[in-house]
Amino acid sequence: MNRFRIVLVVLALAVSVGVSGCVTGKVMTLPGNLARSGMREAPQTAAAGRVVAVLDFTFAGTPPYEIGRDFDHARTIVWKGDPGEAMADLVADVLDEKGFRAVRVPSGEAVPGDAIARVWGTVDKFRVDSRKSGSMRLKVESAASVSLTVYGTGGSAPPNWNSTVTSDFWTEDALFVTPEGVRKAVTGAANAVAEETVRRLVAAGVIPGGKSHPAPGR
């Protein structure tokens, strides 16, 4: 091993020890809420009467939700947001972008009477794990996986229509894991699921008058 590689290894170990010393309570809390990671399309003007009701998706557990693990620091990753509400928000946002007037319906509230379609379901998986990667372990990879089972009624959809959508998304941080990097991975996976969910809703005829878009390449 040459001198340059020795210096890099020593620096990496020093940073790792320093970061580990700053960890309190063996918990990493993710900041903020999920958001659309750059709109793929400009929002379109919603047509009158085209209201789509998106009910909060269900998710097992109680807040703050344990959604993953930082293996290098042996700590859990928690998020104070609600994955079911967050996914409903993202699906509604994608519908808005495509020209539908989407209304998110919180749990226990009535569906608007003028809704042309109703969307609901369960968040089956909402997880992100982080660990060091690479031959010298100088990078940290955060791998997120989100899975959603969606149901829909309305339009020309067949009875009991449902579909399961899953997406994985990876990000890398230099040297050590950060809450922002972990959140970016979760946001990427969640947005991909929301976009594909809307595509399938339109293709199945749950939402009348829509145009089916091909799934983006990954």
Q: Where are the language model's segments positioned?
A:
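Bacterial N-terminal signal peptides
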Residues: V9-S20
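A structural "domain/chain start" motif
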Residues: C22-A92, V198-R218
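Surface-exposed short loop/turn segments
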Residues: V23-P31, V105-N160, E172
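Generic short beta-strand segments
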Residues: L55-T62, T122-D129, V165-D168
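Short secondary-structure boundary motifs at beta->alpha junctions and helix caps
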Residues: H73-D82, Y151-I207
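Structured segments of extracytoplasmic/periplasmic soluble domains
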Residues: L90-R101, F126, A192, E196, ...
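Surface-exposed patches in mature extracellular/periplasmic domains of secreted proteins
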Residues: R101-G108, G205-G209
